[in-house]
Amino acid sequence: MNKYYWIACGIAASSLLAAGTQAQNPVTQKPVKQKAPYLNRSLPLDARVQDLISRMTLAEKVDQMVNNTDAIPRLQIPAYDWWSEALHGVARSGVATIFPEPIGMAATFDDSLVNRVGTAISDEARAMYNAAIREDSHERFGGLTFWTPNINIFRDPRWGRGQETYGEDPFLTAHMGVALVKGLQGDDPHYLKVAACAKHYAVHSGPEKLRHVFNAEVSPKDLWETYLPAFHALVSDAKVEAVMCAYNRTNDEACCANTYLLQDVLRNQWGFKGHIVTDCDALEDIYKGHQLAPDKVHAAALALQRGVNLNCGDTYFALIDAVKQGLVTEKQIDSSLAVLLRTRFKLGMFDPSADNPYNQIPVSVINSPEHRELARTVAQKSLVLLKNDGALPLRNDLKKYFVTGPNASSVDVLLGNYYGVNGQLVTILEGLASHIKPGSQMGYKQGILLDRGNISPIDWTTGEAKSSDATIVVMGISGLLEGEEGESIASPTAGDRLDYNIPQNQVDFLRKIKEGNPHPVIAVITGGSPMNLAEVQKLADAVLLVWYPGEEGGNAVADVLFGKVSPSGKLPVTFPQSLDQLPAFTDYAMKGRTYRYMDAEPLYPFGFGLSYTTFAYSRLKVSGGALHADASSASGTVPHARGAQASGTVLRVGQSLAVEATVTNTGRYKSDEVVQLYLTHKGSSLVVPLFSLKGFHRISLAPGQSKVVHFTLTPQQLSLVNEEGLNVQPSDTITISVGDAVPTPRSLALGASLPVQTTISVQ
């Protein structure tokens, strides 16, 4: 039961006794007579909404359909701004807990942890809102409608906003997105804690500079296999309250006026009942950028007819003229507004304050010790160890440590984008300094600038590094170089990274430190996207990818480097060796992209990440209907890596499949492990992925401990998507692989565990 329920019940009882026929409006704190049906909570929701709409003028209705709505004093409706952000913590609204950027959350492969993050964020959001309403404050970014999560597919490492996503895989993205939305929206049967929003619907991932004019051309197969599954999951499984349409066109129709995406798929096929909101000024793009309408009036009419309920921007004010010109009717506006107002009713904005348990959440939850500890845990589990030649974990009692690099003392590399603020930010330098023992020394110099050569030719850094027992170089990129159009002030390409390399001055600096240095050099890499780390991989004794790790990032990095916690993050994106391995940035076809369709050998493969311990996989068993196979012995190569194999078993079309495997910690350290299940289809006439992630579990194992991990594969998960975009389950052969990375030779060469595998036939 909701933890605030019993508090609310007591307050509600006393409030009702005191109020009699009047209720205290939670937003205005002014008496409102209960005789108005829209204020009568006992009436059906739709009846209340219709009653409220019936009391509005056309101008008032239209005003309620833009993000920054005016108050309607005669109805005691306050001003409200629909635009709030909470990508990895409440953003742009003051003090809040700052969790790792979503790409880092994805690296945890832990959807239950992400659900806890969503719960913490929405608790803080409600507490902030409650405090603001008491002060009669209705500022932007202070509401309860949050335009998050970003569940676009990170199909190309050049996209600057890929850091906001859960990576390149639709299965992982769906699970992480569903978990966050459920945490955000809460579990009360009557009220939403906050309203989440799935964005950017539906085929949107750069280039940033072209997003207001670009047409993403995508086949039915790629649309339904890659770009739509996460949105479908959030609508059907998480009951997400809102969907945001994107700036660009998809297959020649503007996403915010797209008959197929908004009506045929979202409303009719999926049965979406929530509201559709535009990205900010996307309706302006319809007549300016895409030139699909002659003017603002026609663009507003087109969007309304296609199902858009809320306009972030001012284009919808033209709906008044659209009615006058006969382009739309007031009845159409009423129908669209009704969908939108349902959200405000579900948030409790027209009910007595005491009726809603979420109104009792106190401000003490904001950046509380519990939330900071959660931020630290998420950051710990997000860090990905890419290389370790025995340099890690470090002892914390060496005589002298040296920390250097452009990002060691940077706050920006903790934050990513869409962030809040607080006084608890722990830089990587601060985290490292707090972990060494008294008597040890730690020196620090930034050494170099982020992305250009030093102005002064004098070098006082590399010599000090070489005289230290261990050097930690904190390098990579930051939000200055990648992000949303307009946010990345050092980016020459609107936040995208058209140069895949890390800044050359950083590579030269690392090389100079390593040359002739007998002591370990550890590279700590910050950033939100894949980058060319080939030289770093060669030069450094250990490489730790830390993403944008949030306010506790410094402590989490130190926890891992000094061995308090074993690294356990896994890559949610493929790191190509170079951009030459990829199609053009503007090509939205999946051929040659991501681990599922890229046949070139990457620098780092999807799902990869090392640990301080080692794991052994064994005893793979599959069963379904009459099928039972035990593939417990290691033999053969199926299809790209050695492992356990069994052949000749048969699964009937339409049956589910149970899979289990045993995982053993064969090393010296306690550690988490992310157990991953991949499918490879053979023998089908369809174009199929090389591999498809269909299951993952995060487990914790002490040295010598074993656990049996269970998966269930549904007929849907065993099916394929054909060229028409339809799910089919053909007769073919499926290889099932269970391990800790995508099962390729490159994964094994980098140190991944040997997977166990079996092959079944589907008939």
Where do the language-model regions lie?
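Bacterial Sec-dependent N-terminal signal peptides
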Residues: 1-29
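Short beta-strand elements
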Residues: 746-763
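A carboxyl-terminal module marker
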Residues: 674, 718-724, 749-751
